[in-house]
Amino acid sequence: MTKKLALKRKGKDAEPTNEVVASSEASENEEEEEDLLQAVKDPGEDSTDDEGIDQEYHSDSSEELQFESDEEGNYLGRKQSSSAEEDEESSDEDDDEEEGSSDEEGEEDEEKDSKSKQADDKPSSSGAASKKAPTTELSKRDTSKPEYQDSDTSDEEDIRNTVGNIPMHWYDEYKHIGYDWDAKKIIKPPQGDQIDEFLRKIEDPDFWRTVKDPLTGQDVRLTDEDIALIKRIVSGRIPNKDHEEYEPWIEWFTSEVEKMPIKNVPDHKRSFLPSVSEKKRVSRMVHALKMGWMKTTEEVEREKQAKRGPKFYMLWETDTSREHMRRIHDPVSAPKRDLPGHAESYNPPPEYLFDAKETKEWLKLKDEPHKRKLHFMPQKFKSLREVPAYSRYLRERFLRCLDLYLCPRAKRVKLNIDAEYLIPKLPSPRDLQPFPTVESMVYRGHTDLVRSVSVEPKGEYLVSGSDDKTVKIWEIATGRCIRTIETDEVVRCVAWCPNPKLSIIAVATGNRLLLVNPKVGDKVLVKKTDDLLAEAPSQDVIESERIKTAVQWSNAEADEQEKGVRVVITHFKPIRQVTWHGRGDYLATVMPEGANRSALIHQLSKRRSQIPFSKSKGLIQFVLFHPVKPCFFVATQHNIRIYDLVKQELVKKLLTNSKWISGMSIHPKGDNLLVSTYDKKMLWFDLDLSTKPYQTMRLHRNAVRSVAFHLRYPLFASGSDDQAVIVSHGMVYNDLLQNPLIVPLKKLQTHEKRDEFGVLDVNWHPVQPWIFSTGADSTIRLYT
């Protein structure tokens, strides 16, 4: 009986998930015993090739085997003699059950005992020679058995370490890693260094499928079924490959709601007739109301409220204060009108009367009467009887009445704030040099308004366009006019190509855009430009009729060729502005009268034109190319739209809150935009911050015609009809958290006024901190 119990315990320790059922025949038992003993191999037979051998792990709870580490850190297996008392106690419990066993079963048990002892002695002799960490292979569950046959639930597995669900790093400082079922310490397996880990990676073919059990510290070799299960989970499939995911649906219960009456008996005739008992009750209630015996619901509620008495009562105040509470709390009296001053007298002093300039300014603000200092114009009469009736009397009385009953009244506490506290602290202009301060040269030669000016990329020459139908090319250093090109109509805009490898000037005159070779500077560039513009490339794309009717490319005639004109681009409406792309191959033109074809983009190398917009969203006034990104800025009268030319979509819409936009200039880095308006304002937009202006500058007294950023220095300038050019410092920092620094530096006012026009255009020198300005006085002025 003792031998049978020992064999059962050995079988459970070696194969926890498989059971060996003994048969009646001795031959079959011997074959099964040999199969069970094949799992235990002698590692001492070949100590060099034992890396891939699977070993079994036994905790200290085993009655037959106990693992202890030797001096080298290896595990040694030894037999433990089971105590006779435990065997007797266990045998006494099973004596009654085993009495009917045959003698053949006893002989078979003895054979099993002898073979199991031999199998246990083999690993004990060779355990000291092995220096690898013990590796266990995950047991294969017999799929033919039910899932919960061996135990109640899957959570109650054969867990040898009983520490529970705790962090295992708590045992890092101890030699053991936990306790088994008998509260005995589980000694940690030997831990190799990095060299051993590296050798295992190279020599062990199953290293990739070996994982460490955190509870026991043993290396566990994953079986093929485990790897297949992991692959199915990683690939997002159902772990059980035998599960049919799309098996046919069996509708055990119908999904349609069937409505059936509980009873289908026809209604009785009396269910349609009024109740006689209710009729009698109602008649009695009516009679009681007439006789006064019964009261209505409202009368009953009134009697209840009268019995209860007042719900709230005055605790401290008397009933006389109720009238005061009904009135408006702290009424605010209407503000009185200002008393008339000396200007409203019928015979005011002469200094209160308007002169011609003040009268003109007062009449100019007819559409904005709230901006006038006085709502009337002072007049002088000899006597009081000559004063006529006041024509605005009824209107002023009416507005006063509206103010009295429509405008809310409130008491405001007047804040006494020092004016110096509100003024921002700006650096001194002396610390922000260099910037232009004086007028150095005046270029004279035009006979009418000079509308546009542009500088060569190297900064040696200057081109200007005027209303006298001429284009002049100047030498900047000497002020000498090198060449004059006459045109048929007024020159609205000129722009020098920013590509230093080409020498091309775009001239907008009337409906034509002229591409001119100025024939100045390097002769190699002049010849290269002529070769580029000599022949038209072959057209690979068929242009639509919409583009053909809007623009036409042609070579210049012989007389224009002598002047330097090489290509003529004829538009269907007058051109107002022309601008180049940074690379010099594309240029855009603006025709405010062109409706949905107001803006055109031309490609010089292919002689092809494009209409970027199919619909008009306002009168286009100005366009610009982004210096870095493929973006296109379009300014209408009130707003600015930014389009992505690659994606062909609207990126952002900037709100200027102005009446009419006159010009734009973009910072060389492309993150800030400067806008000029005809209502005396300059708007600074931070494109990364908001769609509203970061700062609004009112530095001019009249309309601002033009603004420009310097390409190298942190400077920008503006020109206005007040004959002034204001130079300002505009530093943009690389730190996105720091706002731009804007400081007005110098006001340059040397132009003369002609027909209410002042400075029409400003442009910076590409290298030096110099600025050019054109004015209505037919001059071009250089400030350095």
From Swiss-Prot:
Gene Ontology BP, a term? regulation of hemocyte proliferation
Q: Which organism is it from?
A: Drosophila yakuba (Fruit fly)
**InterPro entries assigned:** BOP1/Erb1, BOP1_N_dom, WD40/YVTN_repeat-like_dom_sf, WD40_repeat_CS, WD40_repeat_dom_sf, WD40_rpt
Output the Gene Ontology cellular-component terms: nucleoplasm; PeBoW complex; preribosome, large subunit precursor
Q: Please identify the protein, giving its name as recorded.
A: Ribosome biogenesis protein BOP1 homolog
SMART domains tied to this protein: BOP1NT (SM01035), WD40 (SM00320)
GO MF assignments: ribonucleoprotein complex binding
Q: What does this protein do?
A: Required for maturation of ribosomal RNAs and formation of the large ribosomal subunit.
Q: Where is the composition biased (Basic residues)?
A: 1-11
Keywords for this entry?
Answer: Nucleus, Repeat, Ribosome biogenesis, rRNA processing, WD repeat
The family database entries (PANTHER family) matched by this protein are listed as: RIBOSOME BIOGENESIS PROTEIN BOP1, RIBOSOME BIOGENESIS PROTEIN BOP1 BLOCK OF PROLIFERATION 1 PROTEIN
Composition-biased stretches (Basic and acidic residues):
112-123, 138-148
- Protein family membership: Belongs to the WD repeat BOP1/ERB1 family.
- Repeat as UniProt keyword: yes
As for subcellular location, the record says: Nucleus, Nucleolus; Nucleus, Nucleoplasm
Q: Where are the WD repeats?
A: 445-486, 488-526, 570-612, 615-653, 656-695, 699-738, 754-784
Ranges where the record places region Disordered: 1-159
Renumbered to this chain, the Acidic residues biased-composition regions fall at: 27-36, 45-54, 62-73, 84-111, 149-158
Q: Where is the composition biased (Low complexity)?
A: 124-133
What's one Pfam family here? WD40
> What's the domain of life for this entry?
Eukaryota
Does Acetylation show up as a keyword for this record?
Answer: no
